[in-house]
Swiss-Prot record:
Keywords: Detoxification, NAD, Oxidoreductase, Plasmid. PANTHER family: DEHYDROGENASES, SHORT CHAIN, ESTRADIOL 17-BETA-DEHYDROGENASE 8-RELATED. This is 2,5-dichloro-2,5-cyclohexadiene-1,4-diol dehydrogenase. It comes from Sphingobium indicum (strain DSM 16412 / CCM 7286 / MTCC 6364 / B90A). Disulfide bonds: none annotated. The keyword Oxidoreductase applies.
Length: 250
């Protein structure tokens, strides 16, 4: 387990799935965690289980004032900012590209792209102001490195996240700030579990498209994210870590 004792990390989308698993592992690794979500009940439940090492802040990452407030509240609560896991996103049910409405396309871009940009912007500014050599991890997706049929707006958004990650790494390496992307394959999140409960064929299909023969559990993604956030990955920046069971290898 990575040692993050005394470090302060923001986790967006921290109320469930990969985000929740990452909060739990960060706390176990000694970090203070600012848990951000739009689901107050879920976010507060994560904090209640943290043993006093986490605080919940409501944040819609597509809203600039929310993101600015999240960073300010984190600094006020914990006295610094050492890293961030920008994990909040909105996946959507599959549609052929020409059937995607402009409203749906814009929603994907607002949350997945603009939200990630805003989070990085204010996290980086806070780190530079304090001279912190921090680490930022953005959740991309296999959809950020390959084309996934029927998910045009999500593929476009996650490709943008990968591009923003690389540019930020190049821009801010001179400040000692590392920026990387996590590239999960399918993950057993509550949303995916609901979909599998309604479609008996979905789980076998998802197992079949990952060479390792199964899809991921949230804690496996959390382990990858925490490694990237830690000093164990001190020479890793501008990279896409594919924790995808081999999905992008074929």
């Amino acid at each position: 387990m990575s040692d993050l004792s005394g470090k302060t990390i923001i986790v967006t989308g921290g109320g469930s799935g990969i985000g929740r698993a990452t909060v739990e592992l960060l706390v176990a690794s000694g970090a203070n965690v600012a848990v951000a979500d739009i689901n107050d009940e879920a976010g507060e439940a994560v904090v209640a289980a943290s043993g006093g090492k986490a605080a919940y802040f409501r944040c819609d990452i597509a809203q600039e004032e929310d993101v600015k407030a999240l960073v300010a509240q984190t600094l006020a609560a914990f006295g610094g900012l050492d890293g961030a896991f920008n994990n909040a996103a909105i996946p959507q049910a599959g549609l052929p590209l020409a059937e995607v409405s402009l409203e749906r396309f814009r929603q994907s871009m607002d949350i997945n792209v603009t939200g990630t940009f805003l989070c990085m912007k204010y996290q980086i500014l806070a780190m530079i102001e304090r001279g912190t050599k921090g680490s930022i991890v953005n959740t991309a997706s296999v959809a950020g490195v390959v084309g996934v049929p029927m998910h045009g707006e999500y593929v476009g958004a996650k490709h943008a996240v990968v591009g923003l990650t690389r540019v930020a790494a190049a821009d801010y390496g001179k400040h000692g700030i590392r920026v990387n992307a996590l590239v999960p394959g399918a993950v057993r999140t509550p949303m995916l579990q609901r979909a599998m409960d309604n479609d008996a064929g979905l789980e076998p299909y998802l197992n079949s498209i990952h060479p390792i023969g199964r899809f991921s559990e949230p804690h496996e993604q959390a382990q990858a994210a925490v490694w990237l956030l830690s000093d164990a990955a001190s020479f890793v920046t501008g990279s896409c870590l594919a924790a995808d069971g081999g999905f992008t290898a074929i």
